[in-house]
Every structure is written in structure tokens, then in C-alpha cells.
């Protein structure tokens, strides 16, 4: 909604400055929002004179102040703009407070879950077909903490793209092929147990993998057996394929339990195995174009600009078996043909940056136009994530720990309510804590995880967001708001209400910024600020004991704040709780 008011201001500024009508959009982009204050009113928008200068800032500070005074003197207040002022070389604008209140509350009530997504800001965005590949664990291995980041980041990006109207395909590209599976397949006959596999599938397969890796370091024969098992797999050996399929099926069944806890889902479970044959077709295409070179270590493709192999990628081992990048090439080509996507986003840790740079370059060399539509979203490492028992290895341990700690905190709290399912509520709050802690900074940055900090109910945490949402929801039990077209604006003129409405006005711009950068931190910061503003308003505004008209207006206000807070939390992948 903020863009609408920017445009109204920009139209008047453009007229006064004698600018052509096509300049209005550029002027609107120069108009900035003013930081919201919780306890006193501030203007809504600000236009710095330097931003209107062609080629950037010019002139002295006093010149800019004088220009601001001159421009402000020519502008007039109207039904939209109630006050025009100047400060530090800029012109400030205050929106008519009654108009702001009525427009924001009515728009939220009308749009519901779509609030902020139907504004002018998004009107010119084309609806696209988006593929998001994320999570992508290696089968027969338990989730580790890195999979938490890939899963929740990918889920957020997919949610965001879907929210703005894109057709989104969520792909879980399983690591279900390659030499590591050769090791597991060869090692299961020596270290595996059908009984243990049935009792705790992923834990037992992990134990087998550790044992066979340790043994392979001392016995080269085991490495050779692993290579032989992989060759048998790629050759279609029935016994090897049967064992592989069994491990794959039970892995997906176990992963589904984790995804359910995280609120993640996928449209397509594919994997490297799907492309073992297609990868050979891709290699033939490259060979027919004279792009492959054979070396002692395998077959490579030259990626250097000079053609001197200063940069290259190995696409086939010397024994003829395929590599991870070969299967990724085949997967990308297949998706281009199958989905005809507008963009494909890969979400992995930053250590794979070079891999994706090579992949996209190879696709370009192959003449695939959609290579330019591929993007890698890298993320950093989580450090210091431990349970009470010690260093965490598996994601399941982290989720259990979050639930356990929240149950303890809820039991110790004097304000906790009687809940139908305390464990489920604790799980949702704990996962909110993990997501907010993860999303606060730049995704590519490493960060140190702190349980005590993440689970605070009063700081900038997921627990605080859940607490605020539940608190706002509890107000609705007092009285049901009536028709949103008719409410007493005079009961909503306190500075804390205006500050909250100013913040709600800017929701669409925050979503747009997230869409530009694919970074959730903007939305996290916005929601935390909204939570603090809502709590100030909750302490200030009286509902009980006020007149029917005042109570109705204030309950409508709180209901709409709760709706936007909940909408934003859902975009992040958080399930809001109504009681805690």
C-alpha cells in the first residue's frame, strides 16, 4: 500500500517541478519511508533533494536545505497529505491520519491472507514458472543441521514465489547415486543387520556407513568393492538395484516424518539416479560438439576463456562412471524440457558455489538459453548447535531439543494456559525459534547458535512472535468485530496505533525486497518490529470497560495486526499458535 501514497506524492512533486509525466515513477522511487517510532508520531515519507539530482548528490548541504524549503513552499496539503515539512535537506510528508487508518484496516480486512500482495507494487510483475530445488539429502543418511538450513530457506523461497502468483515446483533432489552409495552397498553385507535396519533404518545405515568408511581407509580392497558395486548399479544389476531401491524407499519414509515436523512439502522427489542414463546422452551431445577432452584422471570439459584448461570440470571418471556434476547437467536439461521454467533456484551451502558456477557455464557452452535463468542461493554454516548431551549431529536431535526446552519453559511460566496438546504447541514454538534465529542475518553468513537466546520470550525471537500472535488472538474472545466498513476512527488516534498502522502500510515493500534478494531477514526484522509495536498498543489501548464503539474499533485493529503477523510468519514457514 505504501507505493500508492508514494505515487500520489510523486505526482504532485513532478507537477511542481515541471517534470514530464514519465518521470513520476522515478520520483516515487526516490521517496523513502521514515523510520517508525513506537511512542511518538513521525512523518510517513521523506524526499531528499540529493536523490532528485541527475547523476547523484551535488551542491552543499545548505543548498539542499534551501532547495527543500523552496519545494515544500510550492507543495500543498490535500485530502491525502495532511502535513508537509522539511528537515536536513529533505521534504517530509504526513498522510491524513483518518485516511491512513481507514484504508489500512479496510484493506487488510478485505484482502486477508493476500494483504500486501495485490498492491500496485506487484501489478507489473509477470507470473512466472519457478523451480526451487532444496533440502536434497543423501539417502541412507540421517538429516544433519545443514539440511535444516537448506529445507527452511528453500521452503521460504518457494512460499514467497507462490505468494506473488508464480507457479512453483518444489523439488527434492536426492543424493541417491554415486560412490558413497557404492560404499554403503558394498559395506552392508559385512556390517549390516536386517533387524537393526527394520528397527531404526537411518540410524543403522549411518552406523554401517561410518564403519565401512573407517575400514576403507585401511583396506583398499573395500574401495575397489565400492567401485565395483557402483558399476553394477550403473549396469542395471538386479541385486544391486534391489538393495539400492530398498534403502531409497525407507530413507524417503523417514525423511517424510522430519518434513512434516518442519511444515515442508515437495511436488517432486527426484534424484541423481533418475539421470544415470540421461547423463550419458548429455555427454554424447558434448562429445559431438567436440567439447570433451580425455585425460589420465577422466573426461573433462574446458571452461577457460583461453582454451588452455586453466579452468575445467571433470564430467566422467576414468573408469567410465558418471559424476555428481554430470547428473546435475542432465537434471537441468531435463527440467528445461519438462517444465520450460522461467527460473530455477538451487538452495545449498556455500561450499557448492564453484560447483554451480561450473554447472551454469557448462549449460551455456551447450547452448542452453535457460542457463541464464538458473540461480544458486548459498548459505553459511551453523556453529555451536549442541544438545544437553553434547555436539549435535542429526536434525532430529535439534527438533527434539527445541520441543523439550520449550515444554520446560512453558511448564515454568506462570502465564502458560491449559493446552489440549502441549507437546504440539511446544514443537511449533520451538521450530519458530529455530527459523527466526536462522533467518535474522545474511543467509550466506555463518552464525553461532545459542539455545538460551533463541528461546527467549521477550527478545527478538520466534518465541516472541508466537507469544505476540497468541496474545492478539486471545483478544478476539472478548467480542467479535462488526462490519469493517463502519468503525470509530476517533478510538484509534493514539500514537502507538498510528505507528503500527504506518508499519502495516509498508508490508508490501518488505515482501518486494525479499523477492528481489531472496533474503528472509527483511521480513523477520519487519515482523519483530510489528510484534513490539503490537505489544505497546496492547498495553496502551483499553478494550474491556470501553464503549461498544471503541471496543469494536480496537478489536478490529488488533485482529488485523494479528492477521498480518500470522501471514508473515506463514511465509517464513512458521505455523502460528493461538494459545501458549
UniProtKB/Swiss-Prot annotation:
A Pfam family it matches: tRNA-synt_1d
Protein origin, superkingdom: Eukaryota
SUPFAM superfamilies per UniProt: Anticodon-binding domain of a subclass of class I aminoacyl-tRNA synthetases, Nucleotidylyl transferase
Motif, 'HIGH' region: chain positions: 136-147
Residues the entry annotates as binding L-arginine: 136-138, 147, 324, 328, 352
Transit pept. (range): 1-16
GO biological process per UniProt: arginyl-tRNA aminoacylation; mitochondrial translation
Keyword Endoplasmic reticulum: no
Purpose of the protein: Catalyzes the attachment of arginine to tRNA(Arg) in a two-step reaction: arginine is first activated by ATP to form Arg-AMP and then transferred to the acceptor end of tRNA(Arg).
Family the UniProt entry places it in: Belongs to the class-I aminoacyl-tRNA synthetase family.
CDD domains: ArgRS_core (cd00671)
SMART domains in the cross-refs: DALR_1 (SM00836)
Protein's UniProt keywords contain Ligase: yes
Name of the protein: Probable arginine--tRNA ligase, mitochondrial
Gene Ontology cellular component annotations, sorted alphabetically: mitochondrial membrane; mitochondrion
Location(s), subcellular: Mitochondrion membrane
Keyword annotations from UniProtKB, A to Z: Aminoacyl-tRNA synthetase, ATP-binding, Ligase, Membrane, Mitochondrion, Nucleotide-binding, Protein biosynthesis, Transit peptide
InterPro entries reported for this sequence: aa-tRNA-synth_I_CS, Arg-tRNA-ligase, Arg-tRNA-synth_N_sf, ArgRS_core, DALR_anticod-bd, Rossmann-like_a/b/a_fold, tRNAsynth_Ia_anticodon-bd
Enzyme Commission identifier(s): 6.1.1.19
GO molecular function: arginine-tRNA ligase activity; ATP binding
Catalytic activity: tRNA(Arg) + L-arginine + ATP = L-arginyl-tRNA(Arg) + AMP + diphosphate
Amino acid at each position: 500500500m505504501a507505493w500508492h501514497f508514494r505515487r500520489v506524492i510523486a505526482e504532485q512533486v513532478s507537477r511542481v517541478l515541471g517534470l514530464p509525466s514519465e518521470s513520476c515513477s522515478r520520483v516515487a522511487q526516490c521517496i523513502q519511508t521514515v523510520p517508525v517510532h513506537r511512542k511518538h508520531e513521525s512523518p510517513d515519507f521523506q524526499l531528499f533533494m540529493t536523490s532528485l539530482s541527475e547523476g547523484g548528490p551535488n551542491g552543499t548541504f545548505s543548498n539542499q536545505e534551501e532547495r527543500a524549503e523552496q519545494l515544500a513552499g510550492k507543495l500543498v496539503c490535500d485530502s491525502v497529505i495532511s502535513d508537509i515539512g522539511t528537515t536536513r535537506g529533505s521534504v517530509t510528508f504526513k498522510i491524513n491520519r483518518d485516511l491512513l487508518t481507514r484504508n489500512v484496516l479496510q484493506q487488510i480486512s478485505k484482502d486477508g491472507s493476500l494483504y500486501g500482495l495485490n498492491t500496485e507494487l506487484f501489478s507489473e510483475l509477470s507470473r512466472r514458472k519457478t523451480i526451487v530445488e532444496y533440502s536434497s539429502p543423501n539417502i541412507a543418511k540421517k538429516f544433519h543441521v545443514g539440511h535444516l538450513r537448506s529445507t527452511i530457506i528453500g521452503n521460504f523461497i518457494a512460499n514467497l514465489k507462490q505468494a506473488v502468483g508464480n507457479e512453483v515446483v518444489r523439488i527434492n533432489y536426492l543424493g541417491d547415486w554415486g560412490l558413497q552409495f557404492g560404499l554403503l552397498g558394498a559395506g552392508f553385507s559385512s556390517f549390516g543387520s536386517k533387524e537393526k535396519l527394520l528397527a531404526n533404518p537411518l540410524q543403522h545405515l549411518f552406523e554401517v556407513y561410518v564403519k565401512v568408511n573407517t575400514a576403507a581407509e585401511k583396506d583398499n580392497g573395500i574401495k575397489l568393492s565400492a567401485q565395483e558395486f557402483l558399476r553394477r548399479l550403473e549396469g542395471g544389476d538386479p541385486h544391486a538395484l534391489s538393495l539400492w531401491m530398498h534403502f531409497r524407499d525407507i530413507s524417503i519414509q523417514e525423511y517424510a516424518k522430519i518434513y512434516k515436523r518442519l511444515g515442508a512439502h515437495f511436488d517432486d522427489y527426484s534424484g541423481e539416479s533418475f539421470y544415470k542414463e540421461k547423463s550419458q546422452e548429455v555427454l554424447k551431445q558434448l562429445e559431438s560438439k567436440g567439447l570433451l577432452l580425455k585425460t589420465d584422471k577422466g573426461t573433462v570439459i574446458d571452461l577457460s576463456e583461453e582454451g588452455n584448461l586453466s579452468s575445467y570440470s571433470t564430467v566422467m571418471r576414468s573408469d567410465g562412471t558418471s559424476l555428481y556434476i554430470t547428473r546435475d547437467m542432465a537434471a537441468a536439461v531435463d527440467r528445461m524440457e519438462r517444465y520450460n521454467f522461467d527460473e530455477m533456484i538451487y538452495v545449498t551451502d556455500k561450499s557448492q558455489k564453484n560447483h554451480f558456477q561450473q554447472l551454469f557455464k557448462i549449460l551455456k557452452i551447450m547452448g542452453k538459453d535457460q542457463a541464464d535463468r538458473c540461480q544458486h542461493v548459498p548459505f553459511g554454516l551453523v556453529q555451536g548447535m549442541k544438545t544437553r548431551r553434547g555436539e549435535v549431529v542429526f536434525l532430529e536431535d535439534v527438533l527434539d531439543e527445541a520441543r523439550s526446552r520449550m515444554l520446560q519453559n512453558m511448564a515454568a511460566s506462570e502465564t502458560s494456559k491449559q493446552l489440549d496438546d502441549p507437546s504440539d504447541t511446544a514443537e511449533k514454538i520451538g521450530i519458530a525459534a529455530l527459523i527466526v534465529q536462522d533467518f535474522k542475518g545474511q543467509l550466506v553468513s555463518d552464525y553461532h547458535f545459542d539455545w538460551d537466546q533463541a528461546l527467549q520470550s521477550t527478545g527478538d525471537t520466534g518465541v516472541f512472535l508466537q507469544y505476540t500472535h497468541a496474545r492478539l488472538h486471545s483478544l478476539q474472545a472478548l467480542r467479535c468485530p462488526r462490519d469493517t466498513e463502519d468503525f470509530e476512527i476517533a478510538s484509534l488516534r493514539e500514537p502507538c496505533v498510528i505507528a503500527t498502522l504506518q508499519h502495516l502500510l509498508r508490508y508490501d515493500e518488505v515482501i518486494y525486497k525479499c523477492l528481489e534478494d531472496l533474503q528472509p531477514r527483511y521480513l523477520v526484522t519487519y515482523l519483530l518490529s510489528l510484534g513490539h509495536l503490537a505489544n505497546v498498543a496492547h498495553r496502551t489501548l483499553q478494550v474491556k470497560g470501553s464503549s461498544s464503539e471503541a471496543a469494536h474499533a480496537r478489536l478490529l485493529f488488533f485482529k488485523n495486526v494479528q492477521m498480518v503477523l500470522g501471514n508473515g510468519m506463514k511465509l517464513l514457514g512458521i505455523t502460528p499458535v493461538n494459545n501458549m
